[in-house]
Amino acid sequence: MSTTIAVLTGAGISTSAGIPDFRGPDGVWTKHPDQMNVYDLDLFMNDKKQREYSWRWQKESPVWKAQPGVAHKALARLEQAGMLNLLATQNFDALHEKAGNSEDVIVNLHGTIGSSHCMKCGQAYRTADIMAKLDQEPDPHCHKPMPYQGNMPCNGIIKTDVVYFGQALPEGAMEKSMRLASQADQFWVIGSTLEVYPAASLVPVAAQAGVPITIMNMGSTQYDSLATRLIHEPIEEALPKLVDKTIAGQK
């Protein structure tokens, strides 16, 4: 029976794909703390100018042109080898999906930028369609006809499915991640500072279940003492080697 590995990824796995991290030494929020307001739910819902700024900022994000790097592709190989039971990610860039990982293992803890919803009626939208009309409608609102209002448009605020500060994680995301992390034979943390909760709590959950933990991150984390293996090397170099070695060990 093959080894099962649960993985948590953070922004560090995507920096080599051209997406800057948020909390590292050169992170967006480290250098520009005011940019955290882009993802503040209360401001977004109550301040028209903030909504417009948030939409413009997200439209200009490098996420849209980014392609998966060798580290993302390594995790796709791990799944193809039948060894990956969980890929929980704090990233909303969808690069794991682009690399070939399946919805069966991916849990987008912090949502995804590719889809959007009306905060009033729940109508779903493709974010790319909204972005294409942003010059004409800088503060996107829902146009779904409401039968009980004489087919007048809903006019609710539209927001991307990225989880904002003050917003709950997708339903069941943490429960599934905690269960699979505690059932795995190994738990790997890849490119996360482990500063954001509840995602960071997966480490002590796995540790309490007796699961060996690998933390691969350029900087130290608060949970390094729980790790059985620490790797402070560039992820795009270290992760493919670790995956290849792990797969080879099963043959």
Question: Can you name each region flagged by the protein language model?
Answer:
Residues 1-251:
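Conserved catalytic core of sirtuin-type NAD+-dependent deacylases
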